[in-house]
Amino acid sequence: MFYYLYDLYFNHLDSLRIFSYVTFRALMAGLTSMLVTFWFGHKIIDFLYGLKFRESVRDDGPKSHEIKKGTPTMGGLLIIGSLLISVLLWGNLKNPNVILLSVFSLSFSVLGFADDYMKSVKKIKGGMRARTKFILSILISFIFCILFFYYTGTTGQTGKISFQLTDLFFPFIKGPVIALGIIAIPFSILVIIGSSHAVNLTDGLDGLATGTVLISVMTLGVIAYFSGTPIVANYLNIPYLPGAHEYSVFLSALTGALFGFLWFNAHPAQVFMGDTGSLFLGATLGMIVILLKKEILLLILGAIFVSEALSVILQVGSFKLTGKRIFKMAPLHHHFELGGLKETKIVIRFWIIAVILAIISLSTLKIQ
C-alpha cells in the first residue's frame, strides 16, 4: 500500500523515495508482522481457547505429550493474518506475483483450518479425509502454478545463458540441467504438496516447525533479493528473475510473523500452529523455490523436513512389508524423544542443523 501510494501521489518527493526501496520495505515488513503478532498474540490465543479450538494428542504418542492436551491450536491464523497485513502495507501490489503468493498462502491456510476445525471442534478423528485434502491440495497447486507461469513469463537469463522458466537447475552446476517442458506443472505440484506435508509432519514439538521454517524462509529471502538484482545475479551466475526481489518483502514479512509466533510457541507452548499454519508454510516454501528456480536446493535447505517425511515413509513401508518398525516412532523427532532426549534439546539441535543447512545452501550460489 505504501509503495502504491508513493508511486501514485508522492514520487516527486525525494524525502519519501525510501518507500520505493526494497530493502527498506523488507525490513519494515518484518518489523510490522512481528509487532502485529506480539500485539494480537494473547488475544488470539484467548479467542481460540474460548472457542475450544484445542489440541488433542495421539494415543500412541510419547507420554510427555499428555501435558499438551487442551493447548489452543489453529495458531496459524496469527501467522497468516500478520503476514497478509504486513504484505498489504509494504508489498508492491502492482506485482501480480506478490498478490498471487499471498492468496496462494491463504488458500492453503484455509484448507488447514478446515482440517483443524474437523479435528478440534467436530471431533472427527484424523480430521478431513486424506483423499479429500490431497485432491484439494492438487487443485489449489495446479491453479496457482498455471497463474504464476502465466504472469512470470517463460524465459529468463543467468549470466550469458538464457533459460526457460520450466528448466530445472541443480546446486553447484552452472545453467539449467533439465528441460522439464510440460512436465514442469506436475513437477511443481509435487514440490508444493511434498513440502506442505513434510512441514506438517515436522510440527510435532514446541517450536520445532516454527524455528526450522523460519531459518529456511530467511535464507530464501536472501536468495530472492539476489535473484531479483541483476548485478548480483550475474555476479553469482544464478538465474536473474525480474521482480523476484519483491519476494524478499513477502518473505521478510513471513519471517517477522514466525519470530512473533515463536514467542508463544516456544516450550512450553501457549499455542500450536495446527494444520492452519503448517500446511500453508510448507506450501509457501514449495512455491517460493519454484519461483526462484531452487526446487532441488530445497532438498538441502529443507533436509530436516525431508528426513521427517522420509522417516514416516520408511516406517510405514517397513511395517507393511516385514511387520517390523525401523524407528521407535515416526516422524523422526519422536524417535529421538523415545530415545531419551528432552524435547527442548531435540528442538535446539534441529535448529542448529537448520542453520548449517542454510549456510550450505547459500554457499551453493557461488560454488558452481
Curated annotation (Swiss-Prot):
It is a multi-pass membrane protein. This is Phospho-N-acetylmuramoyl-pentapeptide-transferase. NCBIfam families: mraY. The chain crosses the membrane at residues 31-51, 73-93, 98-118, 134-154, 175-195, 213-233, 249-269, 271-291, 296-316, 345-365. The gene is mraY. The lineage of its organism: Bacteria, Pseudomonadati, Spirochaetota, Spirochaetia, Leptospirales. Belongs to the glycosyltransferase 4 family. MraY subfamily. The keyword DNA damage does not apply. PANTHER family: PHOSPHO-N-ACETYLMURAMOYL-PENTAPEPTIDE-TRANSFERASE (PTHR22926), PHOSPHO-N-ACETYLMURAMOYL-PENTAPEPTIDE-TRANSFERASE HOMOLOG (PTHR22926:SF5). Its EC number is 2.7.8.13. Catalyzes the initial step of the lipid cycle reactions in the biosynthesis of the cell wall peptidoglycan: transfers peptidoglycan precursor phospho-MurNAc-pentapeptide from UDP-MurNAc-pentapeptide onto the lipid carrier undecaprenyl phosphate, yielding undecaprenyl-pyrophosphoryl-MurNAc-pentapeptide, known as lipid I. InterPro entries: Glycosyl_transferase_4, PNAcMuramoyl-5peptid_Trfase, PNAcMuramoyl-5peptid_Trfase_CS. It catalyses: UDP-N-acetyl-alpha-D-muramoyl-L-alanyl-gamma-D-glutamyl-meso-2,6-diaminopimeloyl-D-alanyl-D-alanine + di-trans,octa-cis-undecaprenyl phosphate = di-trans,octa-cis-undecaprenyl diphospho-N-acetyl-alpha-D-muramoyl-L-alanyl-D-glutamyl-meso-2,6-diaminopimeloyl-D-alanyl-D-alanine + UMP. Pathway: Cell wall biogenesis; peptidoglycan biosynthesis. It comes from Leptospira interrogans serogroup Icterohaemorrhagiae serovar Lai (strain 56601).
